[in-house]
Regions:
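Solvent-exposed loop/turn segments connecting transmembrane beta-strands
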Residues: 65-73, 98-101, 105, 113, ...
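Outer-membrane beta-barrel biogenesis signature
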Residues: 40-71, 281-289, 361-369
Length: 369
């Protein structure tokens, strides 16, 4: 994007994710062929009428992001593959095929890279109702946005939170996760993981870290509060921690989420909410409309400006507010639009986004009646 660091760090983050090779795509195709064969063998051992089938689901979308007058076109497909192996084993993976296109500084047609990425590929073993063992490459369970809100169909605003790059998106290793009731009114969920160093392909790298997340869920209030911690086991061996909040009131079509994260790279928070106008009685078409908003703030850490740019972080302390509308055209299809404003010593900027998102689900086998 342009030369101003504040106006370009979001675009650099998208372009950096897009500058990937074909290695992940080749590995994903090989993995798909292998696990589908294994799934068929495992399903053949189950009684007739109880055989689960693989499922291909995911999202697709196209968006236009305008930052301080500079436009970037983004198109992506994010397939998710679920392959059950008997009653206790599950293989799951998510790929990302994304194109990020911009006009060159001197003018001309849009151009840019198209990436094929593998976000995660993991095997889950359901040991009992309270523990699931995960091995492979998985989404790092720090906070809630990366794991629960990242897909374009789920998120209410398409711009990434400013603090998202503070933690690695994926880890390579093993994870234990699960949940259990503490009482009739309180449930506890947890995740504990360890990740090994991976220095092979640029987009399959991971750090040597250990960490965990704990959440307390109150079913009566439909509210969750929790905290995350991560320790780097190499180089500076720094600690990182965060807190999260989620709430969906019983009587209102409202979703509230918030996160705080702190590390040597920076710190900050975001709070967002989305309200579906499904209770409107005067004009039925308004029931398909969702109103969303977010406020957030980022504080620079002790790393250099070049290191911050490489991670996709803002180059200076930044405040941002954003307002958006999502209209659900039909089941599985929505149109989005939003406007935001950034405030920073590096320069203020307007943020516009419009686009459309689609979700799909396809069984990869015959479903028994």
């Amino acid at each position: 994007m342009g030369s101003c660091p504040l106006l370009s760090f979001r675009g650099r983050r998208r372009l950096r994710r897009a500058r990937t090779g074909l290695l992940r795509a080749c590995r994903a195709v090989s993995l798909l062929n292998f696990i589908c064969c294994v799934s068929c063998l495992a399903a053949a051992q189950l009684p007739e009428g109880e055989r689960p089938v693989p499922v291909l689901s995911g999202t697709a979308g196209t968006f236009s992001f305008v930052t301080a007058g500079q436009q970037q076109l983004d198109a992506q497909v994010n397939p998710v593959l679920l392959v059950p192996l008997g009653e206790r084993w599950l293989i799951e993976s998510r790929a990302e095929i994304q194109g990020a296109f911009q006009r060159p500084p001197g003018g001309g047609p849009y151009g840019g890279p198209v990436s094929k990425n593998l976000d995660y590929a993991q095997m889950d073993y359901i040991a009992n109702p309270y523990v699931t063992v995960t091995m492979g490459r998985f989404l790092t369970p720090f906070g809630i946005f990366n794991e629960r809100l990242y897909p374009i169909w789920i998120r209410s605003l398409q711009q990434d939170p400013l603090i998202l790059p503070l933690t690695p998106e994926s880890s390579d290793g093993m994870m234990l996760r699960g949940g259990f009731p503490v009482s009739a009114k309180v449930n506890l969920n947890y995740a504990a993981y360890g990740s090994a160093v991976s220095t092979g392909h640029n987009n399959l790298q991971s750090d040597r870290v250990a960490g965990g997340r704990v959440g307390v869920f109150l079913p009566g209030l439909r509210m969750e509060v929790g905290g995350s911690w991560m320790k780097q086991l190499q180089d500076a061996r720094v600690n990182q921690f965060g807190f999260h909040f989620a709430w969906q009131p019983v009587k209102l079509p409202l979703s509230m989420h918030a996160e705080y994260a702190r590390s040597n790279q920076g710190s900050g928070y975001w709070v967002d909410g989305a309200y579906r106008l499904s209770q409107v009685s005067s004009w039925r078409k308004l029931r398909h409309l969702e109103v969303a908003g977010r406020m957030e703030q980022f504080f620079s850490g002790t790393i250099t400006a070049d290191d911050a740019a490489a991670l996709g972080l803002a180059p200076a302390d930044t405040r941002e507010g954003e307002f958006g509308l999502n209209y659900f055209l039909k089941d599985g299809l929505k149109a989005i639009g939003s406007y935001g404003r950034q405030f920073s010593p590096a320069g203020n900027a307007n943020l516009w986004s419009v686009g459309i998102a689609y979700r799909f689900l396809v069984p990869l086998g015959r479903i028994e009646p």
